[in-house]
Amino acid sequence: MAKNLILWLVIAVVLMSVFQSFGPSESNGRKVDYSTFLQEVNQDQVREARINGREINVTKKDSNRYTTYIPINDPKLLDNLLTKNVKVVGEPPEEPSLLASIFISWFPMLLLIGVWIFFMRQMQGGGGKGAMSFGKSKARMLTEDQIKTTFADVAGCDEAKEEVAELVEYLREPSRFQKLGGKIPKGVLMVGPPGTGKTLLAKAIAGEAKVPFFTISGSDFVEMFVGVGASRVRDMFEQAKKAAPCIIFIDEIDAVGRQRGAGLGGGHDEREQTLNQMLVEMDGFEGNEGIIVIAATNRPDVLDPALLRPGRFDRQVVVGLPDVRGREQILKVHMRRVPLATDIDAAIIARGTPGFSGADLANLVNEAALFAARGNKRVVSMVEFEKAKDKIMMGAERRSMVMTEAQKESTAYHEAGHAIIGRLVPEHDPVHKVTIIPRGRALGVTFFLPEGDAISASRQKLESQISTLYGGRLAEEIIYGVEHVSTGASNDIKVATNLARNMVTQWGFSEKLGPLLYAEEEGEVFLGRSVAKAKHMSDETARIIDQEVKALIERNYNRARQILTDNMDILHAMKDALMKYETIDAPQIDDLMARREVRPPAGWEDPNGTNNSDSNGTPQAPRPVDEPRTPNPGNTMSEQLGDK
C-alpha cells in the first residue's frame, strides 16, 4: 500500500513539472503598467523595446529593465517609438515543440488508458500481474514447507481418511503402483455438509504426501470477460504439469461444474465453456500423469454427469457429520490449545452435541474459551462449555430486552406446553432445557436434546413431534382462550405443517394415498435445474393430500389438548417455576413432572437471599407425589425447537 502511494505521488510531481515546462516562460524583471511605459517613451528614457505579441520587454537608458503589456491594439505605438529613437526589436511568438504538441494531443487518451489499466489491475487483485493477465490462473500454490496440516489434525472421519490414504501412498511412491500397472484415481470428489472438514482433509493429504498443493475456488474461474474461465483452467493445469506430482484442490466446484444445458443460460454461457475445458484437461487427448484433482462440494446432485464419470472424478468420498466417537476426537483436537479444568470430559460434551459438524465443535470450544475469558478465569470448565452449547443451539441471551409480567407469563405457559407434551408423548427426544429468557429471535425456547445420533424417524416419533409443536399454542388457548392466542406459534405451525405434508407426500404415511411419492421436484434454476416444473398429480389428488395433512394435524392437535387438560396442575407449576427461575433444566423438569417440590437450578442465586438448602448447604430431597397422567400410546414426532 505504501509503495503504491509513493509511486502515485512521484507520478503527480512529474506531471506537474511537465505541464509547467510547457507553459509560458516567466519574463525577467519587474512589471509596469502601459501608461507609465508611454510616459517614459515621451520623456526619452527608453533605449530598446522588444515586442513579442502583446508583451514588450523594455530596456531603459539607465539599463533598468521591465515588462509591460499592450492592453489594446495601439497603431501609433511604433511611430511614437521611432520618433523618440527607441530601438525596436520584433520577436516571433513562442510555439510549443513537436514533442510537446504530441504529448498535449495524446495526453487525454493516455490518461484514459492509464485509468482503465489501473482499475483492471484492481479487479485482478493488484500485485505484479499485468493488466491483460485475465487468463492467468488464480490458483495459489503452497509448497510442502507451507503445509503443516497432517492426518493427525483431522478427526471424526476415519472412513474418509482411509479412502484417501492410498492417494498419499501413490504421491510418495508412484513407482510401486506403476510397476503393477495400477493407476491412481485422477480425481477425488469430497461430498458432505458444510463444516465437516472437506478442505481440511485435502490439506492433510498434501501435507502427508509432501507435494505442491494448488488451491482455488470454483468461483475464481469465471469473470466479466468471455473466455477467461477456459484460459484459467488451461493455465492452471500447465502450472500443475510443471510441478507434478502435485494436487489441485477446487473448493465449491459446483460453481462451475453444474449440469450443462439447463437453467436460464441455455446451453451456451461462459460457465459451460469453463466446464468443457476442465473436462478436457482432466481426461482429454493429452494425459495429466502425476496430477490429482481433489474437489469439494455439498451439492453433488447438481454436478454434470460427465464430470463424475470414471477417468475424471473416479472416486467420491463422503465426509459426513461425525458420530459421538468422532465428535469426541474432534473436541480433543481443538482442546489442545485451550487450558482445561480437571472436570472437562470430552465424551460427555460429545454426547450432548448430536448433529454438530467439525466447524460447530471448533466454534463450541472457542465460545467456551471466550466465556472463561469474560469471567477472568484461568481455565475453561464444563460450566463454560454448557453456556457455549446453549448459545450455539438456542441463540445468545437478550437480557436487555424488556418484557412485561404479562408477556413473561404468556411465554412461560407457551414453553411449558411444549415441554409437557414433549415429555409425555412416546418416542420423543428428552427435554434438555426450558427458558423464557429471549434468545436470538425467540422470546423463549424449549430445547429437546436427542439421546443419540438420529439416522431415521418412525411414524410415531414424527407424530409426537407434531403434537409437541402445537403444545405452546394449545397452552395459551387453554389458559387465555381462543381470542387471546398470540402469534408466537407461527414457526411451530410452519414446521408442523411441512412435517405433516412430507409424511403424506414423501414418506408414505397416509393410508388413503399409500406409499407413493407425490412431492413435486423442488430445484431452483440457478442450481442447474429446469425452469419448468412438472406437475405429477391431478387436482383431485392434491385435494386429498390437503385433507390427509389436515386430518393428521388435527389428530395430533387434539391429542396434545387432552394431555394438557389432564395435567393442568403441572402446567401451572411449570409456569411458576419459569417465572421464578427463568431457566429450568432436566432435573427441575423431572421434579415438576413427578409433582415434587422443584429444586433450584445449578448456580441459581435467590434475589431474596434464601434457597432450598439445609444447614449444610445441600439441596433438600424432593418430596415425591403422584405421577402425571399420560394418554394411551398412539401414533406420534417433534421438532427440536418450540420457539415462542
Curated annotation (Swiss-Prot):
Kindly list the places in or outside the cell where this protein is found, as annotated in its UniProt entry. Cell inner membrane
Query: From the record, what ranges are coiled-coil?
Result: none
Q: Does the keyword Membrane apply?
A: yes
Please list the GO terms describing molecular function: ATP binding; ATP hydrolysis activity; ATP-dependent peptidase activity; metalloendopeptidase activity; zinc ion binding
**Any idea which positions bind ATP?**
192-199
Where is the catalytic site?
415
Q: Which InterPro entries match?
A: AAA+_ATPase (IPR003593), AAA_lid_3 (IPR041569), ATPase_AAA_core (IPR003959), ATPase_AAA_CS (IPR003960), FtsH (IPR005936), P-loop_NTPase (IPR027417), Pept_M41_FtsH_extracell (IPR011546), Peptidase_M41 (IPR000642)
EC assignment: 3.4.24.-
**Protein's recorded name:** ATP-dependent zinc metalloprotease FtsH
